[in-house]
């Protein structure tokens, strides 16, 4: 991994205030982003921009992964659900933060991306990440309830199933909207959901029974 490039990117994110938590900084430093993108794109791996990974999907910009990890308030030992595996990069970063005592379940609907991300995550030794082929808008009841849930595609709203599979005290982070999208944070407290608008974003559409 080109250390100088990633140090430069992370330093820029810190100076802009995108990331502050040491756990997030360490995770972004540890995950080799170039392993999660097509070889033809490797020279762009540490440019802070979304990149195409095939099948009409993208790997999120480094700053967006960092922001989402910060806003999720991740911690060691948490049980986390990701809706939309894509390349597997985001799941790897979260895996680094929750550690061996935590677990990341990530759902991908596109078979080609499912196979590729599963292979890369396995080769890199992310044993606490389980990649599932399916409709992420339904959640994944088998490993519920979750302490944290995040969605990497924008839907018309957050599927009810995700709230049902969230632990009390848990957080959901999801982009909501079609052309104009807002990253929303939801927290479940004593069975009630409290929501907060964070920032304007641009994600691929959330496809599924409870998406677009």
Curated annotation (Swiss-Prot):
Compartments where found: Cytoplasm
A Pfam family per the record: PCMT
Major enzyme class: transferase
Active-site residues (renumbered): 60
Membrane-spanning parts: none
Alphabetical keyword list: Cytoplasm, Methyltransferase, S-adenosyl-L-methionine, Transferase
CC per GO annotation: cytoplasm
Catalysed conversion reaction: [protein]-L-isoaspartate + S-adenosyl-L-methionine = [protein]-L-isoaspartate alpha-methyl ester + S-adenosyl-L-homocysteine
Domain of life: Archaea
A Gene Ontology BP annotation from the UniProt entry: protein modification process
Cross-referenced InterPro entries: PCMT, SAM-dependent_MTases_sf
GO function terms (MF aspect): protein-L-isoaspartate (D-aspartate) O-methyltransferase activity
EC number: 2.1.1.77
Function: Catalyzes the methyl esterification of L-isoaspartyl residues in peptides and proteins that result from spontaneous decomposition of normal L-aspartyl and L-asparaginyl residues. It plays a role in the repair and/or degradation of damaged proteins.
PANTHER family per record: PROTEIN-L-ISOASPARTATE O-METHYLTRANSFERASE, PROTEIN-L-ISOASPARTATE(D-ASPARTATE) O-METHYLTRANSFERASE
Family listed: Belongs to the methyltransferase superfamily. L-isoaspartyl/D-aspartyl protein methyltransferase family.
Protein name as it appears in the record: Protein-L-isoaspartate O-methyltransferase
Originating organism: Methanococcus maripaludis (strain C5 / ATCC BAA-1333)
Gene encoding the protein: pcm
């Amino acid at each position: 991994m080109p250390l100088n490039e990633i140090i430069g990117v992370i330093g820029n994110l810190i100076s802009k205030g995108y990331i502050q938590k040491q756990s997030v900084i360490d995770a972004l430093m540890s995950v080799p982003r170039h392993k999660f993108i097509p070889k033809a794109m490797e020279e762009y791996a540490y440019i802070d921009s979304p990149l195409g990974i095939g099948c009409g999907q993208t790997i999120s910009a480094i700053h967006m992964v960092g922001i989402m990890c910060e806003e999720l308030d991740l911690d060691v030992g948490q049980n986390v659900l990701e809706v939309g595996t894509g390349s597997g990069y985001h799941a790897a970063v979260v895996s680094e933060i929750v550690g061996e005592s935590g677990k990341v379940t990530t759902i991908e609907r596109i078979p080609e991306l499912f196979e590729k991300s599963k292979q890369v995550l396995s080769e890199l030794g992310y044993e606490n990440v389980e990649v599932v082929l399916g409709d992420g808008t339904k959640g994944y009841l088998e490993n519920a309830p979750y302490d944290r849930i995040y969605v990497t595609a924008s839907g018309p709203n957050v599927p009810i199933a995700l709230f049902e599979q969230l632990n009390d005290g848990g957080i959901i982070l999801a982009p909501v909207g079609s052309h104009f999208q807002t990253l929303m944070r939801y927290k479940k407290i004593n069975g009630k959901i409290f929501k907060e608008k964070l920032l304007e974003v641009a994600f691929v559409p959330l496809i599924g029974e409870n998406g677009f």
